Amino acid sequence: MIERIAVDPNVHFGKPFIAGTRITVQSVLELLDEGLSFDEIIKDYYPDLAIPDIQACIQYAIALVAAEEIHLTAVPA
């Protein structure tokens, strides 16, 4: 399903987007963060999307975070 996500340096400055569209993964994730349902995103914002496109955005974000090495630094009190 993650194959639905594309990255092209000539589209949105290389930010990941849903293949066949110009809709960024970030845009979809922000709508989810606002509490919108998959159906609301499709009906009210992106009628060309399908539920698997939104699921692919979530899977892409999970894969990105899982692959990243995180280093925490202590913050002085």
Predicted regions and their residues:
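Long, charge-rich, low-complexity alpha-helical segments
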Residues: 24-77
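Conserved phosphate-binding loops in nucleotide/dinucleotide-binding enzymes
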Residues: 17
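Basic, low-complexity segments
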Residues: 1-13, 76
